[in-house]
């Protein structure tokens, strides 16, 4: 039996460091940032969900289901993950941010391999130096635990997953895979890298 894996692209933040611009819609090399992310993950999953708390109509134009946080008040990535976990019947949910246009083309395969090798409930990606808390593969059944954590006032994803059996998938062979865009300067650097990838 093959596993069903869906994905959620997190585009629900305030993007304060980008001057409030909606990061997923910022143009990079002629395409919205989220389009680069979609291109990277679409071949790896069955369904894609987009978590957005503004510009929902614009995000819907990409042809995927758009979900706004069930917990209001821009509570961070956990809120978007909880919402997506409640809208999938998949065995696993891939979580990625909207502003990582160089995500690995084998992201799901390696995260799943880490889960299976470690009998884990979830796997988090690492660039070899640090874990990337918003790049993970997890079981949607963890929604209840994550909801309780968020409703207790907690926000840090790594604090949440530390309470569970988690594995780390290291992508040391792709050191720039998780480079994201938080400032206009980073956007310029990334545009050059995309041209080379």
UniProtKB/Swiss-Prot annotation:
Its cofactor is Mg(2+). It is found in: Cytoplasm. Disulfide bonds: none annotated. One of its GO terms (molecular function) is GTP binding. Mg(2+) binds at residue 99. It is an enzyme of class 2 (transferase). Its EC number is 2.7.7.77. GTP binds at residues 10-12, 23, 51, 69, 99. The keyword Transferase applies. It catalyses: Mo-molybdopterin + GTP + H(+) = Mo-molybdopterin guanine dinucleotide + diphosphate. GO terms for cellular component: cytoplasm. Belongs to the MobA family. Monomer. This is Molybdenum cofactor guanylyltransferase. The lineage of its organism: Bacteria, Pseudomonadati, Pseudomonadota, Gammaproteobacteria, Alteromonadales.
């Amino acid at each position: 039996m093959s596993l069903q894996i869906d994905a959620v692209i997190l585009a629900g933040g305030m993007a304060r460091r980008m001057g409030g611009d909606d990061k997923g819609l910022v143009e990079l090399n002629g395409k919205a940032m989220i389009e680069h992310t979609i291109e990277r993950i679409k071949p790896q999953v069955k369904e894609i969900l987009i978590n957005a708390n503004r510009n929902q109509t614009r995000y819907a134009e990409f042809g995927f289901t758009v979900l706004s946080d069930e917990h209001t008040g821009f509570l961070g990535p956990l809120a978007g993950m909880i919402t997506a976990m409640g809208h999938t019947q998949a065995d696993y949910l891939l979580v990625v941010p909207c502003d990582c246009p160089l995500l690995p083309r084998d992201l799901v395969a390696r995260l799943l391999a880490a889960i299976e090798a470690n009998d884990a409930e979830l796997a988090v990606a690492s660039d070899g130096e640090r874990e990337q808390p918003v790049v993970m593969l997890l079981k949607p059944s963890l929604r209840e635990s994550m909801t309780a954590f968020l409703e207790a006032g907690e926000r840090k994803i790594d604090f949440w997953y530390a309470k569970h059996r988690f594995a780390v998938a290291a992508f040391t062979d792709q050191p720039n895979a998780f480079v994201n865009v938080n400032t206009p300067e980073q956007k310029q650097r990334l545009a050059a890298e995309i041209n080379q990838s």
